[in-house]
Regions:
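Cytosolic, long alpha-helical scaffolding segments
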Residues: 1-127
Length: 127
């Protein structure tokens, strides 16, 4: 399911950081991690609201919109992070390592957006 995929993407991020052992955690990595954390918290809120869907329809859609906004922010962050990385004086190995970590974090943000589609399907089923 899409939820399994999102969890797998979080695990991939941890694996990439473990394998590549970046010299330091960049501000961009921290920004991505903030987006992932916010998306996870919002997803938990959406799932809890499903219990009272008839009363919470509008609120669920607001929460889904916030998750989608995090995904869009993740896309922009990825573009800016990669641009800045390629324009930096970093060595080739650091560019490859950070690029892979940034991509796995951006994929993680995408996966949460995919889960919102699943939440919407559940909500429609029980509407």
């Amino acid at each position: 399911t899409s939820l399994d995929h999102a969890i797998d993407m979080i695990e991939d991020v941890m694996i990439h950081i473990e394998i590549y052992q970046p010299q330091h955690i960049t501000p961009e990595i921290n920004q991505f991690l903030d987006l992932v954390e916010k998306s996870a918290e919002e997803l938990l809120t959406a799932v809890r609201l499903l219990k009272t869907y008839k009363k919470s329809q509008k609120e669920i859609h607001v929460v889904i919109d916030r998750i989608n906004a995090c995904e869009k922010e993740g896309d922009l962050l990825y573009i800016h992070s990669m641009r800045d990385l390629y324009q930096s004086n970093a060595d080739a190995v650091s560019i490859v390592i950070l690029g892979k970590i940034y991509k796995s974090l951006e994929d993680c943000c995408d996966a949460f957006k995919d889960v919102t589609k699943f939440v919407e399907e559940i909500a429609l089923k029980y509407a």
